[in-house]
Amino acid sequence: MLTLGLESSCDETSCALVENGKILANRIASQDIHAAYGGVIPELASRAHLQIFPKLLAAVAQDAEVSLEDVELISVANTPGLIGALSVGVNFAKGLASGLKKTLIGVNHVEAHLYAACLEEPSIRFPALGLAISGAHTSLFLMPNATTFLLIGKTRDDAIGETFDKVARFLGLPYPGGQKLEELAQDGDEEAYPFSRAKVSGNDFSFSGLKTAVLYALKGNNSSAKAPFPEVSETQKRNIAASFQKAAFMTIAQKLPDIVKAFSCESLIVGGGVANNRYFRRLLNQTCSLPTYFPSSQLCSDNAAMIAGLGERLFCNQTYVSKEVIPCARYQWESACLSH
């Protein structure tokens, strides 16, 4: 089955073609315009998606050397995300589906991030623990199989990617700051600042306290939002970045062993933009006793290959109930319960 995937949940526009689980073409266009504002401006993101989609669609068809007439299924990210951005993608997909007379399926963007690893490693054993880490999400899922996602835990405040961006801004790094903070931390002393990690009950996470601790480390007792940041040496910046990065990722890693045991998981799957962090990859490979799967770098970012792949799998497994595809900014997952 040849499947066209479309992704526009935030500030990346992407089109991809996947055939029977194999990626034929995958194009991603990032929107640099938001850097000047220090964050994503939803209206600008929507306009950019409108302009970019037609060009990307033509490009992936050329890359894969196929005609759009050959597409059998169109899969589009319709939740969760920025409502305007999602609407652009869904409406573009509906127009294509109507014009080409093809079947249309809506796919959950976060679930697709976890399915990305399955595209590259089809032999993952289930049940698996799925960890989605991005700018908007820090969530744990029980995955009885590759297409079922039951919520186990989530952040109670900031997502880890959002926290990275905020701390990067404290350190004077340009937006988006997550990768730049990782690079800064490489030459820092991760033991220089003993940032405490939030002890949240159950399987949830919290990062707001860690963010505040970094603010105090930089500003001292005068940590009000209006107070200017004092001059900090490059060595201090590197040490703060390294110490913060360790504390943030240990907040997650320290919880995983008990959760894995409680739900009898046989694998760990990690997805989302933050999954591309090399420090975190090494940390989990050192601390997790299970086979751990990360997508390749391109499939960590928002991309349409994961949307096409999950849509194709759902359709072929006949686990997708046909319904109108509607964009939705938020999504409420079913929770997993422990059986006693």
Curated annotation (Swiss-Prot):
What does UniProt give as GO cellular component?
A: cytoplasm
Main subcellular localisation: cytoplasm
Q: Which reaction does it catalyse?
A: L-threonylcarbamoyladenylate + adenosine(37) in tRNA = N(6)-L-threonylcarbamoyladenosine(37) in tRNA + AMP + H(+)
Q: Name one Pfam family in it.
A: TsaD
- InterPro entries linked to this entry: ATPase_NBD, Gcp-like_dom, KAE1/TsaD, TsaD
Q: Name one GO molecular function term.
A: N(6)-L-threonylcarbamoyladenine synthase activity
Which cofactor is recorded for it? Fe(2+)
As for subcellular location, the record says: Cytoplasm
Its family remark reads: Belongs to the KAE1 / TsaD family.
PANTHER family xrefs? TRNA N6-ADENOSINE THREONYLCARBAMOYLTRANSFERASE (PTHR11735), TRNA N6-ADENOSINE THREONYLCARBAMOYLTRANSFERASE, MITOCHONDRIAL (PTHR11735:SF6)
Q: What is this protein called?
A: tRNA N6-adenosine threonylcarbamoyltransferase
Question: Could you tell me which species this protein originates from?
Answer: Chlamydia muridarum (strain MoPn / Nigg)
* Recorded name of the encoding gene: tsaD
